[in-house]
């Protein structure tokens, strides 16, 4: 403001020092020194420029001078017009010309100056320029020190910011200043903006320095966060940092974005650690066995979602087989979790517990499978309960063991076979007698029949023998189901056992008397009696069939037209039947047709070699006794088939009686397997 100093004439004629603040059309806004008068507008004619400071002072007696003095104590000093009357050394006697009466005063040389020759200012004495200031720079432009270099560059007398118009005002006494202002104004504003930024950083640095000095003796922690997790650490709109700053005892939280480093300062260690728990986000992985991955995820991700919700982790990711970023163990799949350290610890506890639970469940399941496998290897073990549900019947147990618990009867399988070498049916009465009813002679006779049979027939017999049930459900032998009682006055095996000396062939008398020449007729009569009791359904789905193959000895072709050797024996239906019947009901009368083969068997016999026929004749007596005895349903021996009988020579009743008389004693001993 020194450059805009002017002298304003007062009402008493003295000139007082003032400063130009603004330039108007016909006046100037002047501010007085020390504000002894308020700011006011002064016309141009009452304002003049001060003299140059380097003017040479040469004062002699009689010269007009200006004296720096004041009229009273209330007014400041001003330049008054006076005249030198006397000089004596450095002291001057002056006389004021402004006063009506002469007023003399002795003053020193410093208070004197020559008369100011400058005239009053005019409109063209000052030049004014304005520059609009942006809003962000208005506060900075209010400080006149910011425009110091700009003022010097443009040659302005004064540069200041006008708050009402938001403009930068440049006042100058030179016209060239206006041109310079137009050139440098934009650059000046940019420099102000740059300086403002630097100044603000310096201020922050100063504050930080002061804060650091204060916190040097306090608690602080420093930790790094990965760049990809920095967004999670800061939070949405800095929510995590704000939450950490709200922790009681936290004085400052600093973040270095370049290195991802957090610095937390607080009054206590607990407060600092708590604030750190909000900001420290990490990524960690947990190894999960491959066979348990599906169970850890759960149906529709239910299990893993529950773990994530309870632990508080932000993300979960399953490492793929083609990814090799993380170390992988054999048979393990890494589960990658992202969250705070506390969240990672929570998810680790939950996941380890769940994996341990799944392993225990798997171990129990394997033990269950091992027990099941042992039960299968032992075979058909004890059933826990026959009333159990279908799911409880999944264990395979042995039916024979279960049947032994239920009763004395043995049901060893419901199919064909499953006959052990010591198999004994529970259907027979007096099973011990039934098992021992076969004598050595009968076995020899069966062996002889076996030797006479061909290879094909032997195989067929072996197959049938493997399916036979010794002592089970026979209708004609004594080893059957106790149905050999007499009926209608007919002879029975009991009469033979009571009187061993009697003729055993008396059992055949009733049957031979009813023979006829027509073999087919007797055959049909023989089968008619059996159909009454043999029409039984093999299974629930099959219709009733004639049990011709198993009930008759001379039936070589069954009712379906298939040879017995080619067809599998029908599966017997184990129906409940009365165990005790009359012996005569099951026992059938033996006729000549039982010992005479059909026409097919006769034609087959004619084609046999002579040696086979001769061997058959030698054994005819034994064959006859086997037909009348219980050999058809022997307990443990094979059953003769129609093919075996076809190989035997046919005999008449007379020849059979003669042969029986010759070996009567021998046959009596082996009749029905009882000696």
From Swiss-Prot:
Species for this entry: Xenopus laevis (African clawed frog)
Domain KH: 222-251, 285-314
Record keywords, A-Z: Cytoplasm, Developmental protein, Differentiation, Myogenesis, Repeat, RNA-binding
Biased composition (Basic and acidic residues): 608-631
Name the UniProt record assigns to this protein: RNA-binding protein fxr1-B
Stated role: mRNA-binding protein that acts as a regulator of mRNAs translation and/or stability, and which is required for various processes, such as neurogenesis and muscle development. Specifically binds to AU-rich elements (AREs) in the 3'-UTR of target mRNAs. Promotes formation of some phase-separated membraneless compartment by undergoing liquid-liquid phase separation upon binding to AREs-containing mRNAs, leading to assemble mRNAs into cytoplasmic ribonucleoprotein granules that concentrate mRNAs with associated regulatory factors.
This protein's encoding gene: fxr1-b
Keyword field contains Repeat: yes
Alphabetical list of PROSITE patterns matching this protein: AGENET_LIKE, KH_TYPE_1
Lineage, highest ranks first: Eukaryota, Metazoa, Chordata, Craniata, Vertebrata
Pfam families: Agenet (PF05641), FXMRP1_C_core (PF12235), FXR_C1 (PF16096), FXR_C3 (PF16097), KH_1 (PF00013), KH_9 (PF17904), Tudor_FRX1 (PF18336)
Transmembrane segments: none
Ranges of compositional bias, category Polar residues: 649-664
Localization: Cytoplasm, Cytoplasmic ribonucleoprotein granule; Cytoplasm, Stress granule; Cytoplasm
Stretches for region CC1 domain: 201-208
